[in-house]
């Protein structure tokens, strides 16, 4: 498995619109790619700025190539999303997953 990281910044005002764009446009296009496994958006914010990382998990680098095209490290950013961002990485980072531990939620009885 491979994790693809991309980061950007926006404003508190524009971030909800970016999330709507991500849900309506990005997620459907990711789901259509064989080998896409999951996506997360991580945030760090203050009263004005939202810094965020988009983390996508893929079955292989070949799956990422199907999504990203010939330059897998070039960020894939829809034209309609650009006006929502104050800054963004033009390149992405990929990391091979060497260890993954998931905990199962425990059920508590009241």
Locate the predicted segments by residue.
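Short, flexible segments with low predicted structural confidence
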Residues: 1-3, 18, 35-39
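Short, well-ordered beta-strand segments in beta-rich or mixed alpha/beta enzyme
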Residues: 3-9, 40-70
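Short, surface-exposed ligand-recognition loops at beta-strand->loop->(often short) alpha-helix junctions
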Residues: 9-22
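Residue-level signal for secondary-structure boundary sites
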Residues: 14-16, 62-64, 100
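Glycine-rich beta-strand-turn "strand-cap" elements at beta-sheet edges
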Residues: 40-50, 76-110
């Amino acid at each position: 498995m491979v994790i693809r990281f991309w980061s950007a910044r926006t404003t508190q005002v524009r971030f909800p619109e970016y999330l709507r764009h991500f849900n309506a446009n990005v997620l459907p296009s990711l789901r259509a790619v064989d080998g896409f496994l999951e996506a997360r958006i991580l945030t760090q914010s203050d009263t004005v700025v939202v810094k965020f990382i988009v983390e996508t998990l893929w079955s292989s680098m070949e799956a990422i190539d199907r999504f990203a095209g010939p330059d897998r490290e070039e960020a894939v950013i829809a034209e309609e999303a650009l006006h929502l961002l104050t800054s963004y990485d033009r390149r992405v980072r990929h990391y091979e997953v060497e260890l993954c531990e998931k905990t199962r939620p425990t059920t508590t009885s009241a």
